[in-house]
Amino acid sequence: MSALGESNNKQNGKEILHNYVTKKLTSQPYSCQWIPTSCSVVTVGKKTSGGISKGDIKIHQLEFDDTSGDPKLNLVYENEFTNPFRCLSFFKQANQLQQQDNRKFITGDFNGQISEWDSDICDIPIWGVKGAHQGSISAIDAYADNLVVCGGKDGTIKVYDTRIKPNSANDNNGNNSSPISTFEQTNKSNCWSICTNDNNIIAGFENGDLNIYNLKTNSIQSTTKLNGGICSIDSNDRSNILNQFLITTNKSFISIASFNNNNNNNIEFKDYDINKEPNQTIWSGIYSPWNKKDNENIFTIAQGDGSVSMYRDDCKLIDKVLVSDLPILSLDYSKDRKGLLCCISLKKQLSILISPC
């Protein structure tokens, strides 16, 4: 395992990653993503009211103050729901920079329910499944316009097609909807992370298991074990997620992996130490959708010390910025405006970062 070098937050004397604006929230967000074709960010999480935990959805728009011209985050939507939310995903495309008309997103909550929302009018879900999992849904990923893959604390992974409407005629909350595929985990370890397209699923678990599933044959294609719980998985190519994917863990290391179906179904790993503390959690890692020329990949990670760090594909540190004094839980690149990232922290903060990469 390689160790990464120190950084002074500069590259050739210039700041690369900058904390542009931060706003304190009234609820604890657990996931954030940019709304396609907008300057708005949706956050989902938990809000405590009268000692009762409820679900919370907020939408903030990046704007500029009329007088000072300073950036600000303006709350344009907020609502409470019955169950606290754990995760969210917009529908990803094979070409991540392709203009997206689909502004719908999927949420997973702590009560095992998945719901589809229209980000323009998200007071009531337009589709959903109650009891998709027993207990919390820890990870969710959506692809194309209809494919939803979710993983839960119960150790199972389920695949849904939003074109299949609920059998119940009462509402769109899908009391009787069935998954099109289900994958069981023998040891029932919590599924923490999912990355999918219409061919494969890569799933990471709390106990370090990393499984690859084939959606065409509804079977497990490969399995291996890492020395740490797998917090997030992201691919540099959504059309072929197995070609190269980034794994972050709760043991202070990341791994850049690839799967060669012609190489005895083996997954090849390059592991890198990130933090000096041996058990610091790296909550999230994502590839930049913008920097693809000359086969150069750039990725950004959210760290347990409250910092956000940007790396080249060879794990050379580009820049690092301290955003909070508590862990960064989630981050996302804007697919419409190059250089914009959003992230949330355990300190109930939403931050917008800017970078030329």
From Swiss-Prot:
GO cellular component annotations of the record: dynein axonemal particle
SMART domains: WD40
Pfam families: WD40
Main location: other
Source taxon at top rank: Eukaryota
InterPro entries per UniProt: WD40/YVTN_repeat-like_dom_sf, WD40_repeat_dom_sf, WD40_rpt
Entry's localization field: Dynein axonemal particle
GO molecular function: ubiquitin binding
UniProt keyword Magnesium present: no
Keyword Repeat appears in the UniProt entry: yes
Coiled coil: none
Keywords: Cytoplasm, Repeat, WD repeat
PANTHER family, sorted: MRNA EXPORT FACTOR AND BUB3 (PTHR10971)
Its biological purpose: Key assembly factor specifically required for the stability of axonemal dynein heavy chains in cytoplasm.
Subunit and partners: Interacts with PIH1D1; the interaction associates DNAAF10 with the R2TP complex. Interacts with several dynein axonemal assembly factors.
Protein name: Dynein axonemal assembly factor 10
Organism, scientific name: Dictyostelium discoideum (Social amoeba)
Gene name for this UniProt entry: dnaaf10
